[in-house]
Amino acid sequence: SVAKSAQFPLHVWLPDAMEGPTPISALIHAATMVAAGIFLVARLLPLFIVIPSIMTGIALIGIITVVLGATLAIAQKDIKKNLAYSTMSQLGYMMLALGMGSYRAALFHLITHAYSKALLFLGS
């Protein structure tokens, strides 16, 4: 889940996926690839809620990913890499919401992020 949704320790593949054509980048970053990890954690959330240390770990990974993604997005000159790191930061917010136990907020953010980021990629 951490690798699939480009969270903190395993986030290095995300900007390199921007080398392809724009419609493929929009599909990867908005709908399918990065959403799968968040959706997996959301589906397994009833199991994770039982153990508070797992929830704390999920929230901590989310916080680190938010800060790292936003910082790396500020430093980019390429618009596609900027959007990739922005996606990483937004996925960190979703992971943080799941770590705090807010299933609905995380899935709402996932759906709205998919639409807005797909339009941003197609417009870049």
Swiss-Prot record:
Transmembrane segments: 22-42, 44-64, 91-111
Name of the top EC class for this enzyme: translocase
Primary localisation category: plastid
Catalytic function, reaction form: a plastoquinone + NADH + (n+1) H(+)(in) = a plastoquinol + NAD(+) + n H(+)(out); a plastoquinone + NADPH + (n+1) H(+)(in) = a plastoquinol + NADP(+) + n H(+)(out)
GO function terms (MF aspect): NADH dehydrogenase (ubiquinone) activity; quinone binding
Keyword terms of this UniProt record: Chloroplast, Membrane, NAD, NADP, Plastid, Plastoquinone, Quinone, Thylakoid, Translocase, Transmembrane, Transmembrane helix, Transport
Single Gene Ontology BP annotation: electron transport coupled proton transport
Entry's localization field: Plastid, Chloroplast thylakoid membrane
Assigned GO CC terms: chloroplast thylakoid membrane
InterPro entries referenced in this protein's UniProt entry, alphabetically: ND/Mrp_TM, NU5C-like
EC nos: 7.1.1.-
Membrane topology: Multi-pass membrane protein
Family from the record: Belongs to the complex I subunit 5 family.
Biological function: NDH shuttles electrons from NAD(P)H:plastoquinone, via FMN and iron-sulfur (Fe-S) centers, to quinones in the photosynthetic chain and possibly in a chloroplast respiratory chain. The immediate electron acceptor for the enzyme in this species is believed to be plastoquinone. Couples the redox reaction to proton translocation, and thus conserves the redox energy in a proton gradient.
Subunit details: NDH is composed of at least 16 different subunits, 5 of which are encoded in the nucleus.
Protein name: NAD(P)H-quinone oxidoreductase subunit 5, chloroplastic
UniProt source species: Pisum sativum
Top-level taxonomy: Eukaryota, Viridiplantae, Streptophyta, Embryophyta, Tracheophyta
Gene: ndhF
